[in-house]
């Protein structure tokens, strides 16, 4: 399925049904009193977060959504039925905003969470409601109240405990493939990952956490360069970030400058995102050139108070220690096998 994480929706709640003008007409009763019923309430527009949904694709194909109108009242004091609510199911993690003002209206972060965003119009009162001692035969009724309309912006932010961050081809997809059942495309060229993917990572004692892989970040990403800028928002809910650094290209490229460039892009995109806990991971430890440069790189980070975790997704070396560090940061302790 194509991954769609943003969509604009034009939604309308239902108009209320009209009240009825009617009078009793029975044998031997020539001039019966008013008995027009009330109109029914219009349907609401309701959003529900549903586990199992992973994209807003279906809503992109149906941008105009309208709840049912309330039914009109009838004679003999019969009230109109309420219009059916329009229930729109969205992935967990969907944020709904007013497309015009940008105001956030709802953040559906839990499975089953529901919110009524647009209320249906009230039904109009029938003429039976307006009879009085001085006005016994009212020949008017209320129209139904109009429903509400809104232009909404829906934005999906993936729900993950751990987010992967780094340049294109830094080894993010290889890592998530190694430790989870996720199968993103992997190749030896930039931007093989063109959409976010989630993987459930099993840990010790049947515990697990969710990891998100997004396209690599390049310089200028906060201004729209590359692919990663579109997907940085998917890291905003992550508890911690793994910043993957590939040092195998030294000296052709400077991995330390690249690390600082990615950190800069993160800060310019969102200072709050940049302030999240980060774990620095040196990838491709199975390559000889990585091992040759590791001590130099480790020293640079340690001088800045940053511990690094060298790993190889190909052989699994260092991966267990990295998972223990993730567990310690997520849950405050490392699990022991039993």
From Swiss-Prot:
An annotated Gene Ontology molecular function: GTP binding
InterPro entries per record: G_OBG, GTP-bd, GTP-bd_Obg/CgtA, GTP1-OBG_CS, GTP1_OBG_dom, GTP1_OBG_dom_sf, OBG_GTPase, P-loop_NTPase
UniProtKB keywords: Cytoplasm, GTP-binding, Hydrolase, Magnesium, Metal-binding, Nucleotide-binding
Cofactor(s), by name: Mg(2+)
Pfam families: GTP1_OBG, MMR_HSR1
Binding site for Mg(2+): 173, 193
An annotated GO BP: ribosome biogenesis
EC number annotated for this UniProt entry: 3.6.5.-
Role according to the record: An essential GTPase which binds GTP, GDP and possibly (p)ppGpp with moderate affinity, with high nucleotide exchange rates and a fairly low GTP hydrolysis rate. Plays a role in control of the cell cycle, stress response, ribosome biogenesis and in those bacteria that undergo differentiation, in morphogenesis control.
Quaternary structure annotation from Swiss-Prot or TrEMBL: Monomer.
PANTHER family according to UniProt: DEVELOPMENTALLY REGULATED GTP-BINDING PROTEIN-RELATED, MITOCHONDRIAL RIBOSOME-ASSOCIATED GTPASE 2
Annotated family: Belongs to the TRAFAC class OBG-HflX-like GTPase superfamily. OBG GTPase family.
Protein name (record): GTPase Obg
Taxonomy of the source species: Bacteria, Pseudomonadati, Thermodesulfobacteriota, Desulfuromonadia, Desulfuromonadales
């Amino acid at each position: 399925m194509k991954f769609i994480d943003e969509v604009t929706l034009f939604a309308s709640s239902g108009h209320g049904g009209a009240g009825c003008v009617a009078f009793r007409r029975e044998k031997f009763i020539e001039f019966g009193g008013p008995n027009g019923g009330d109109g029914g309430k219009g349907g609401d527009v309701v959003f529900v977060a549903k586990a199992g949904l992973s994209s807003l694709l279906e809503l992109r194909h149906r941008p105009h959504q309208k709840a049912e109108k309330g039914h009109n009242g009838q004679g003999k004091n019969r009230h109109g039925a309420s219009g059916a609510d329009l229930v729109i199911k969205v992935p967990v993690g969907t944020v709904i905003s007013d497309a015009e003002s940008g105001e956030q209206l709802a953040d559906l972060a839990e499975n089953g969470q529901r919110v009524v965003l647009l209320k249906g119009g009230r039904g109009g009162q029938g003429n039976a409601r307006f009879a009085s001692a001085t006005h016994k035969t009212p020949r008017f009724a209320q129209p139904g109240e109009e429903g509400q309309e809104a232009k909404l912006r829906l934005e999906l932010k993936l729900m993950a405990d751990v987010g992967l961050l780094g340049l294109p081809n830094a080894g993010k997809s290889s890592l998530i493939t190694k430790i989870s059942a996720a199968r993103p495309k992997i190749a030896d060229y930039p931007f093989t990952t063109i959409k976010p993917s989630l993987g459930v990572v099993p840990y010790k004692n049947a515990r697990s956490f969710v990891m998100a892989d997004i396209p690599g970040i390049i310089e200028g990403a906060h201004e729209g360069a590359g692919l990663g800028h579109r997907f940085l928002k998917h890291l905003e809910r992550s508890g911690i970030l793994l910043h993957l650094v590939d040092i195998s290209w030294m000296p052709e490229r400077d991995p330390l400058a690249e690390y600082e460039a990615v950190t800069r892009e993160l800060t310019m995109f969102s200072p709050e995102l940049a302030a999240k806990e980060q774990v620095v991971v040196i990838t491709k430890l199975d390559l000889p050139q990585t091992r040759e440069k590791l001590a130099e790189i480790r020293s640079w980070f340690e001088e800045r108070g940053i511990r690094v975790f060298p790993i190889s997704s190909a052989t699994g070396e260092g991966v267990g220690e990295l998972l223990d560090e993730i567990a310690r940061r997520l849950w405050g302790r490392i699990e022991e096998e039993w």
